[in-house]
Amino acid sequence: MARHLAVTGEEDPCSLYLRDILFGKLPGYKCHRHKLNHLGQAKGILRGGNMAVFHGLRGTPYDIPPEGTILFIEDVGERPYAIERMMYNLKLGGVLEKLSGLIIGQFTEYKEDYSLKKDLYSTLDALVKEYDFPICYDFPVGHVTENLPLINGAEVEFVSGKKGVELLINPPI
């Protein structure tokens, strides 16, 4: 987010959202519907971030507890097979089945690996299609120009609907 501020300036919409958060005004985000989204709604604690960093914390005291979590993931510069492997780690480790929701953000600075026979989002979708919780793809978070600020540990309401995605950040109790 710091790089984002330096590159886009303080009047950029994402910078304004960050300023609002810092001054106690919590945003609600709405974005487009992706064709792979899984419809549904959930409440939970927003946790996540960079997939490689998150993966490196697995099995440590800093690992994210999956129960009641709406997990968001993004990454930069990782190869698709590495992202697939990290997602398999979450699946086989029992993390995915305990989530309340999954927000798949932007994966940038990589080249599609056509040996996987499908694009990255389709590869990830094959690993999560069995779950009942809401899932959205292409959420504007990550190392991108439209990088919405998210609050790790915030209670959120997440809706993946036919007309789009909504993420509401609730005030702390």
Could you say what each language-model-derived stretch is?
Residues 65-119:
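Internal helical hairpin/lid segments
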Residues 25-33, 63-68, 97:
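Short, structured loop/turn "capping" segments at alpha-beta junctions
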Residues 45-76:
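Conserved beta-alpha junction segments in alpha/beta enzyme cores
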Residues 9-13, 45, 49-52, 78-85, ...:
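Conserved active-site and cofactor/substrate-binding residues in soluble primary-metabolism enzymes
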Residues 109-173:
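ATP/nucleoside-binding phosphotransfer catalytic cores, i.e., glycine-rich phosphate-binding loops
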Residues 1-57:
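Conserved anion/nucleotide-ligand pocket segment
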Residues 38-39, 46, 63-65, 95-96, ...:
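Solvent-exposed alpha-helices and their adjacent loops that cap or buttress functional pockets
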Residues 54, 102, 153-156:
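Buried hydrophobic positions in well-ordered alpha/beta secondary-structure cores of metabolic enzymes
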